[in-house]
Design a protein with these regions (language model features):
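C-terminal regulatory/oligomerization modules of transcriptional regulators
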Residues: 1-17, 143-164
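Charged, amphipathic alpha-helical coiled-coil/dimerization segments
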Residues: 89-150
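Pre-recognition alpha-helix immediately N-terminal to the DNA-recognition helix
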Residues: 28, 55-59, 120
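N-terminal leader segment of winged-helix/HTH proteins
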Residues: 1-47
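Alpha-helical hairpin
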Residues: 18, 49-51, 114, 140
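N-terminal helix-turn-helix DNA-binding core of bacterial DNA-binding proteins
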Residues: 20, 37-81, 164
């Protein structure tokens, strides 16, 4: 029995007219997400990054050579507002991790590209990040992992379909 079970017991005692079963799912997801995010933040902080900065650098890195995307593509991949992205890019550019260049495709727009320093940093940090994720998921038996992924994928898809 965990803390969430004890909370559910209290609700069942106090409000037997309510089916509080979903509270267990949401309570555990919230507690787990909070703990996982705290653990992942340690990797970012150890490398003088925020999760937001990591997301931008990782998005550029996984795009493949020349590790450059338009600002609108970055916004689409990271799902943030334009102003939010501008602030992130300004901070990363000030650190020399990215640079804004004229878009070679049309000569008018711009692209955001990893610098050599940014590429070296994200290659190191993403390796640490993945190792950390392996460490964090080790508490879940390997045979349960595909089932969790399947359930979460289906649940997330139901929200994304409604959002259009």
């Amino acid at each position: 029995m965990d803390q969430v079970d004890r909370i559910l017991e209290q609700w069942n005692r106090e409000r037997p007219d309510l089916d509080v079963t979903p509270m267990g799912t949401f309570g555990r997801l919230k507690r787990l997400a909070d703990q996982l995010l705290r653990e992942m933040e340690r990797v970012y902080q150890a490398n003088d990054l925020t999760q937001a900065g990591f997301d931008v650098l990782a998005t550029l890195r996984r795009s493949g050579p020349p590790y450059a995307l338009t600002p609108s593509a970055l916004i689409s991949w990271t799902m943030v507002a334009s102003g939010t992205m501008t602030n992130r890019l300004d901070r990363l550019e000030a650190r020399g991790l990215i640079e804004r260049r004229t878009n070679p495709a049309d000569g008018r727009g711009s692209v955001v590209a990893l610098t050599d320093e940014g590429l070296a940093l994200i290659d190191r940090v993403v390796a640490e990040h993945v190792a950390n994720q392996h460490r964090l998921i080790a508490g879940l038996p390997p045979e349960l992992r595909p089932h969790l992924d399947e359930a979460l994928r289906a649940w997330l898809a139901s929200f994304e379909e409604r959002a259009g």
